[in-house]
């Protein structure tokens, strides 16, 4: 069982959604993750929101014209997410992820990597990488008090990914070693006959 389900009991979907609705109503920008991801995409790119929760990031990316799927294994979160018909929703544990499609970009926002079941981190990053097309990007963000940037880099490297960029926030603040947040972008390598088309 993931640390998220252990800590929440899989029952926080409605309250989580309401908290973000209140933030948005107060004028707060609740689309920082989607803004960063959208800046890495081309029109119509296929996106997987891994650990999508209530679908906040996935729904916003779909609204912007991208082909989006979301996956989570918290039933209360997916209940909220499924209210949006513009996204394909999957109920699956990321440690067992085996979807019938591949993506130009996989995003794991909102501390997904630090809420995984202990000991599954490497397998999850490997499975996320396997869902990328050659040249595809894995974008992850988390609090650094629960996992260091270096530890995540090791997971990504072992999954065959190459580092592309790192920031201290979803607003692309330059990386600092003492940052509270880490947002990392890694790429699945391309071979000469598997080039991502422009």
Describe the function of each predicted region.
Residues 54-96:
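Class I SAM-dependent methyltransferase SAM/SAH-binding core
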Residues 135-142:
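Conserved beta-strand signature within the Rossmann-like core of class I S-adenosyl-L-methionine
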Residues 1-53:
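Conserved class I S-adenosyl-L-methionine
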Residues 95-105:
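A short acidic, Gly/Pro-enriched loop at the edge of an enzyme's catalytic core
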Residues 105-119:
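A short SAM/SAH-binding and catalytic strip from SAM-dependent methyltransferases
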Residues 122-134:
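A short glycine-rich, Lys/Arg-flanked "PGG" loop and its adjoining helix->strand segment in the class I
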Residues 176-198:
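Core SAM-dependent methyltransferase catalytic element
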């Amino acid at each position: 069982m993931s640390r998220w389900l252990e800590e929440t009991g899989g029952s926080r979907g409605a309250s989580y959604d309401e908290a973000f609705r209140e933030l948005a109503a107060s004028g707060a920008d609740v689309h920082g993750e989607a803004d960063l991801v959208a800046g890495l995409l081309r029109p119509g790119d296929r996106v997987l929101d891994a650990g999508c929760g209530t679908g906040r990031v996935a729904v916003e990316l779909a609204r912007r014209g991208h082909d989006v799927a979301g996956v989570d294994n918290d039933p209360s979160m997916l209940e909220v997410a499924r209210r949006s018909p513009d996204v394909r929703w999957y109920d699956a544990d990321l440690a067992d992820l085996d979807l019938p499609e591949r993506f130009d970009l996989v995003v794991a926002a909102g501390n997904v990597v630090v809420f995984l079941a202990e000991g599954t981190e490497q397998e999850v990053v490997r499975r996320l990488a396997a869902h990328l097309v050659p040249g595809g990007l894995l974008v992850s963000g988390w609090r650094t008090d629960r996992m260091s940037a270096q530890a995540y880099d090791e997971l990504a490297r072992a999954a065959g990914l190459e580092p592309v960029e790192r920031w201290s926030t979803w607003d692309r603040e330059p990386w600092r070693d003492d940052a509270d947040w880490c947002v990392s972008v890694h790429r699945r390598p391309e071979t000469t006959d598997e080039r991502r088309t422009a």
